Swiss-Prot record:
It catalyses: acetaldehyde + NAD(+) + CoA = acetyl-CoA + NADH + H(+). This is Acetaldehyde dehydrogenase 4. Disulfide bonds: none annotated. It comes from Dechloromonas aromatica (strain RCB). Belongs to the acetaldehyde dehydrogenase family. InterPro entries: Acetaldehyde_dehydrogenase, Acetylaldehyde_DH_C, NAD(P)-bd_dom_sf, Semialdehyde_DH_NAD-bd. The active site is at C131 (acyl-thioester intermediate).
Length: 304
């Protein structure tokens, strides 16, 4: 039995619960705590049934247990508003934060684009952008690694049922954080992000549209090849990531139309937006965990 790094999940909503299912399968990570703020929460009850310790008094109620249970990684799936405080308190105890909110106080991580850059940087907080960011930024990066992109615009459409209260409270943060990461990680000089929450019944699968304006006439063959190579990289951890149409070339505009089907861990397969976020978060944490198990990464407390 290989050693596993113990983890805590903060926020027992759609994202936190879906992530829990994925961590249960991880060869490097062992989820041991689920932290919420409502003792009646379905997510906390479900986590307890799955054998986790639970706490309904927020991060403050969990702090005394961090060191005794040797928790080294925490995933925050709450809300951008509370993430900074959660991170400060846990970083002070030497816990690495994987931020699944749009708070973006740490550097962005989109695994197929820049995961390897985070190795050896000794960061104690990394941000997973947003579900829309994880689904679309690889496509912007696939174009920008071929030639300069003056403008990148992404539209993420998710089903109403998959967007919980935390997601809805963070719409403005979603658009700002995603647009920022389209620039910083995707490589576009200017980025824009739009989210659409679709109430259709039965719920629709996540769909994503990506438009890039290249500075010069697009090299169609090279861009097409780059996009297909990037899709294969994303499919390594999100098998339901699929090209529906494109790349479509119109002058200097390159358009790509994607859909993301989930594994159906917590919500049914239409909720690909949960999968792409939680799988990316788990993949990122596993990379840090592998380093920790090998002994090449030792977490140090950070005092703000």
């Amino acid at each position: 039995m290989t050693q596993k790094i113990k983890c805590a999940l903060i926020g027992p909503g759609n994202i936190g619960t879906d992530l829990l299912y994925k961590l249960k399968r991880s060869p490097f990570l062992e989820p041991v705590w689920m932290i919420g703020i409502d003792p009646e929460s379905e997510g906390l009850k479900r986590a307890a049934e799955m054998g986790l310790k639970t706490c309904a008094t927020g991060v403050d109620g969990f702090l005394p247990h961090v060191l005794e249970d040797n928790v080294q990684i925490a995933f925050d799936a709450t809300s951008a508003y509370v993430h900074a405080e959660n991170s400060r308190k846990l970083n002070a105890l030497g816990v690495l934060m994987i931020d699944l909110t749009p708070a973006a106080i740490g550097p962005f991580c989109v695994p197929p684009v820049n995961l390897k850059e985070h190795v050896g940087r000794r960061e104690m907080n990394v941000n997973m952008v947003t579900c829309g960011g994880q689904a679309t930024i690889p496509m912007v990066a696939a174009v920008s690694r071929v030639q300069p992109v003056a403008y990148g615009e992404i539209v993420a459409t998710v089903s109403s049922k998959s967007a919980g209260p935390g997601t809805r409270k963070n719409i403005d943060e979603f658009t700002r954080t995603t647009a920022g990461a389209v620039e910083k990680v995707g490589g576009a000089k200017k980025g824009k992000a739009i989210i659409i929450i679709n109430p259709a019944e039965p719920p629709l699968v996540m769909r994503d549209t990506v438009h890039c304006l290249t500075e010069t006439a697009p090299d169609q063959a090279a861009i097409t090849e780059s996009i297909h190579a990037m899709i294969k990289e994303v499919q390594k951890y999100v098998p339901g990531y699929r090209l529906v149409n494109g790349p479509v070339f119109d002058g200097n505009r390159v358009s790509v139309y994607m859909e993301v089907t989930g594994l159906g861990d917590f919500l049914p397969t239409y909720a690909g937006n949960l999968d792409i976020m939680t799988a990316a978060g788990a993949r990122t944490a596993e990379m840090f965990a592998e380093e920790m198990i090998k002994g090449t990464l030792k977490l140090e407390p950070v005092h703000a």
